[in-house]
């Protein structure tokens, strides 16, 4: 959640941030009203408690009828105190709900607008010219079939639409990508983590995924648990309710986990293949650091993402995501999009967000800096989302006979230079 002091002291700044995201600014007035109600409820409760304490001092000194009258008054006042306490709890809950509904304040540098209002920051590499190579590129579905790497028919038979099996070279390619990603992360100072893919509601809500993204989340009926759409969720909750040593920051983690997404708003989009699926595996970078250092750390996360894509010898671009497409918790987000030859366009492969103090305030994670305890910041960044990366690698490095050249960085993990077709 945002800093309550910013809401109280700079409400116009919060209103402007809402408008920049394309959202109504009425939520600001609602939150300020809830804050006022909460303060009045606290004052009323404290006044009743003070009256109760004062009355308690008079009773031992009273005698006879006066004492009986005071005792009767005590009973009445006790009920009023209980009522005032309940009213305070209701007001506090309403205030917290109002505050939690406000998204992080988008960075001044983030473009205004929605999904299509991003700004292209740079383009790296040149999309391959298949005409010059003398053949028409196959899409990843056909390549996956020829290589015996992707089985969509059996995925649909067993689990339904947007599911798949990775087999043979496909399974090997996933493991190679995970190993390469984890090797890079470890060499860059990250601690490898295998994260749980089921979490309690607080972890999901604390990361902002029960707000705008609630429709895309799988809930396990009868258990009050959720399947995560990214290991950002368990890693943000990893240090919940903790005070970290400020001198030990940054803490960098590289977490591997399955990711589950309903893709509720994606009807009719990418219905074939493995670009948009209900389940995929991912290596995610996650960082705890000071707010002051978070902006430079964000650039470092982007640099590590770019390094990984360049190891895979992919043409890609970096975009500055517009405020309306940031999601609840992000202050700023950069996406790396790889060129997909058969689609003739760039598609998102990685994303990195600076969430500043938004998640740590919700999850009560703070840092100790000498005698001071204060909120810290979190950042996240995709190092390798497996299925989309497989799509980009297969389509970019395919050869005329349906074989696929293995990028040099992956060759030690795959043990060969070329993936050969098993069928035509």
Swiss-Prot record:
EC annotation from Swiss-Prot or TrEMBL: 6.1.1.11
Disulfide topology: none
Keyword rRNA processing tagged: no
Cited InterPro entries: aa-tRNA-synt_IIb, aa-tRNA-synth_II, aa-tRNA-synth_II/BPL/LPL, Ser-tRNA-ligase_type_1, Ser-tRNA-synth_1_N, SerRS_1_N_sf, SerRS_core, tRNA-bd_arm
Chief place where the protein resides: cytoplasm
Location(s) in or outside the cell: Cytoplasm
Complexes and interactors: Homodimer. The tRNA molecule binds across the dimer.
Family: Belongs to the class-II aminoacyl-tRNA synthetase family. Type-1 seryl-tRNA synthetase subfamily.
UniProt-recorded name of the protein: Serine--tRNA ligase
Organism encoding this protein: Nocardioides sp. (strain ATCC BAA-499 / JS614)
Gene (name only): serS
């Amino acid at each position: 959640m945002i800093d309550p002091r910013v809401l109280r002291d700079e409400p116009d700044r919060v209103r402007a941030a809402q408008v920049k995201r394309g959202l109504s600014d009425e939520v600001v007035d609602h939150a300020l009203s809830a804050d006022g109600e909460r303060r009045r409820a606290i004052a009323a409760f404290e006044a009743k408690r003070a009256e109760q304490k004062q009355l308690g001092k008079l009773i031992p000194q009273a005698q006879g009828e006066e004492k009986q009258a005071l005792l009767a008054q005590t009973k009445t006042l006790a009920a009023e105190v209980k009522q005032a306490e309940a009213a305070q709890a209701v007001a506090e809950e309403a205030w917290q709900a109002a505050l939690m509904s406000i998204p992080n304040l988008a960075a001044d540098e983030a473009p205004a607008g929605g999904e299509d209002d991003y700004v292209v920051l740079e383009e790296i590499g040149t999309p391959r010219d298949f005409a010059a190579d003398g053949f028409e590129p196959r899409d990843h579905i056909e390549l996956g079939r020829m290589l015996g790497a992707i089985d969509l028919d059996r995925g649909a038979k067993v689990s339904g639409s947007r599911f798949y099996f990775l087999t043979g070279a496909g399974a090997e390619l996933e493991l190679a990508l995970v190993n390469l990603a984890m090797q890079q992360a470890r060499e860059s100072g990250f601690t490898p983590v295998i994260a749980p893919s089921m979490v309690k509601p607080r972890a999901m809500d604390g990361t902002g995924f029960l707000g705008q993204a609630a429709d895309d989340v799988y809930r396990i009926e009868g258990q009050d648990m959720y399947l995560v759409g990214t290991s950002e969720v368990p890693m943000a909750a990893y240090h919940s309710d903790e005070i970290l040593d400020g001198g030990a920051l940054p803490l960098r983690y590289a977490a591997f986990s399955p990711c589950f997404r309903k893709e509720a708003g994606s009807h009719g989009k990418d219905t074939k293949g493995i670009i948009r699926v209900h389940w995929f595996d991912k290596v995610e970078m996650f960082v705890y650091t000071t707010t002051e250092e978070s902006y430079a750390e964000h650039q470092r996360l982007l640099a590590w993402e770019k390094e990984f894509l360049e190891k895979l010898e992919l043409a890609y671009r970096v975009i500055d995501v517009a405020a309306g497409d940031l999601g609840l918790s992000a202050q700023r987000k950069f996406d790396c999009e790889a060129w997909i030859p058969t689609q003739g366009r760039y598609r998102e492969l990685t994303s990195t967000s600076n969430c500043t103090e938004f998640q740590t305030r919700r999850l009560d994670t703070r840092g100790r800096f000498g005698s001071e305890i204060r909120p810290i910041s979190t950042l996240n960044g995709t190092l390798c989302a497996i299925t989309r990366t497989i799509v980009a690698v297969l389509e970019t490095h395919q050869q005329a006979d349906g074989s696929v050249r293995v990028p040099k960085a992956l060759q030690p993990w795959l043990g060969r230079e070329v993936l050969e077709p098993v069928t035509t």
